[in-house]
Regions:
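Acidic, mature catalytic/reactive cores of soluble proteins
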Residues: 1-266
Length: 266
């Protein structure tokens, strides 16, 4: 019932609306003067597993076109920012246009966008956006570091998009988005997932990667992982200590060393 209601009222034609104002006016709609499209609704239509697949594909394509800013190296929360709207969206409008949540990069939402892209198999786009979120890439030279203005070794909660300050980092050292960025890397791209004692491998690597190696220390033991592309492989396959398994998951034994080879299609 809830899913039908969402699809019938929240779909705006090319993306999902963020919500509605108290008077019923849509928020995050193509008819909105400000905040036409918001990333969170698009990302979670994928991550929830409840969005119509065709609609989610269209929505994420539109969000990529409208919210990913290659020049500033940011993924905006929404666009355009609130400025002159007669509707009151709340405290967010108190920020200047392009600052923090008001049309800048809200890094929590940006990490969800990366994970959603990876989940859809749009691995090159996921990696491109992840690279934008990686703080070290905002200080590639002295000029970039001077413009960014904050530490390139911690995650910024927000990055500005406003005129004259676009690309400048905001709040640092105090954001839960650091944990989400870690998950975007380890689970979203490398494809290493832990649920309870079960480890699952679903690599979603960019096309220019041949694979990777990793060492996982858990359950008082060590798991050495090699992921390789293989032309003969049609779907993900897993080998544990040289023996093939029937699935991409296994439960490590406490205190043991395990060698894992994950083969993915080339």
């Amino acid at each position: 019932v809830l899913k039908r209601a969402l699809e019938s009222t929240a779909w705006d034609g090319q993306w999902y609306r963020r919500g509605s104002f108290d008077d019923g006016t849509p928020l995050g709609s193509r008819n909105s003067d400000e905040c036409k499209i918001d990333s969170i609704a698009q990302s979670w239509s994928v991550l929830s597993g409840e969005g119509d697949p065709a609609r989610s594909t269209t929505a994420m394509e539109q969000a990529t076109k409208m919210l990913v800013d290659d020049k500033l190296k940011i993924v905006k929360l929404f666009t355009p920012p609130f400025s002159n709207s007669e509707q009151d969206p709340g405290y967010i409008k108190s920020y200047p246009p392009g600052v923090r949540e008001n049309g800048g990069q809200y890094t929590h939402a940006a990490t969800w966008f990366v994970i959603a892209l990876a989940e859809m198999g749009r691995t090159d786009e996921a990696y491109r956006c992840f690279s934008m979120l990686n703080p070290v890439n905002h200080a590639s030279d002295e000029a970039a570091a001077e413009h960014y203005r904050v530490e390139p070794y911690v995650v910024a909660a927000d990055i500005y998009a406003g005129e004259g300050k676009g690309g400048r980092g905001g709040w640092t050292w105090y954001t839960g988005s650091a944990g989400w960025l870690y998950r975007a890397a380890v689970e979203g791209i490398l494809g290493i997932e832990r649920r309870g004692k079960q480890i699952t491998f679903r690599p979603k690597l960019p096309s220019h990667w041949d694979g990777y190696a990793a060492a996982l220390k858990m359950f008082d033991g060590e798991i050495k992982v090699r992921v390789i592309r293989d032309k003969k492989t049609k779907s993900i396959s897993l080998e544990l200590n040289g023996s093939k398994t029937k699935s991409g998951s296994f439960e490590p034994k406490a205190g043991e060393k395990t060698e894992v080879v994950v083969k993915i299609p080339a």
